[in-house]
């Protein structure tokens, strides 16, 4: 029994360590290239991205193909137009009519700098991260692509108080009579952005074309830091083909570009807690492509080709998502988009845990109290199992004097001692393995909750009480890990000590080991384990009293 219990405690630490290692391998960024004097990455084998490095996605010529062709725009930069909603602060450029800057209102980079917001889109060369959208035409016809110059009425647009929807319209016209309106639709509280084109063909010939979405981003690895979980998270492109979700490796894109046709799919760029996604209309096949040049990758979505006869009108619709990975909004935006919240191999447990946590948060208004209530619920679910285990442990605790007598009688005869102890357990109807079950059962729950707290943006910078002002980061003063270590020590005192002196010393050291280990875990996870220990102590103390009275 004692070997099994010791093994399971060590296994818990080992599994947690493996999870940490897997996280680093899965999400760890590639080492950054050497920097130049001005701090920008430099590699003679990697061409710099300049205005000439500009591509347009081609119309699909065969299933899964959307070739890239050189743009033929005027090369101007256009002017910037500001758009502000209750959740987004954006810049749009009239050249291409594209979104090139996005600051997330209410999401500061650090809690102590509320004025410094998380920025997802950025036109600066060192942090290039921009959308490029437009229409492609067949047969060399006029087209309002992302190099076209669009006209717009205002210099700034704001979602007013009491206004639920904001539309921003741009206009374009060709000399031969083709006109287009490009309309962005923003909704209060939403990071989903509608994009609609209204085409009027007053030319003498039919017009044929498709809408496209493109995202260009420079891969900028973060320097790893033990205190910065963002630096270990996966940053890069992902794709969903309507059935499965896949992370795209930058090196693979350099060697072989992605080309696929999917119905109900999407393509996106993610980082810890945030993403930008390009979503074609559902129900129709779209071309999804990805490629890279140097440290810049380009993702594209090309929708189905449509005909607009002479004298007729046509409409093209797409969707962009720019913001935090709020699961409710992700599910509403596109099927499978919630998979960008990566809970790893324990998703089947993590998703129900988050669902319960979310409901409890709705009741309490505080994620810390939601974690405490979740811990109580988990304890209630496994109460009978813990009770059976606790009774077995209490009976074994009462058998300690008799076990000590057996040790003195058999001395170094380990085989004889083992047989005598098994006979004693059998006679007293004690199951020595029962004490291991709660630890074994809690392992997957523990790891699943770890990923929930780490990956769920809902808990990013979420305060609890007193000194805990961010449940997704470590305790800044290490008070909670110390309290957790104390409760582990008390738990051990309530359970029977291992008969082997070496095992006893190892068990006594485990609270110290776990305290150090948990010091770098999210405070919310340590809170869960601390509360779980308190409940286990109360339950075991009650069981010990009952067993001692002969119950």
Please give the residue ranges for each predicted region.
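Soluble non-transmembrane domains of integral membrane proteins
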Residues: 80-339
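Helix-loop-helix
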Residues: 1-38, 92, 197, 211-230, ...
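Juxtamembrane extramembrane loops of integral membrane proteins
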Residues: 9, 24-121
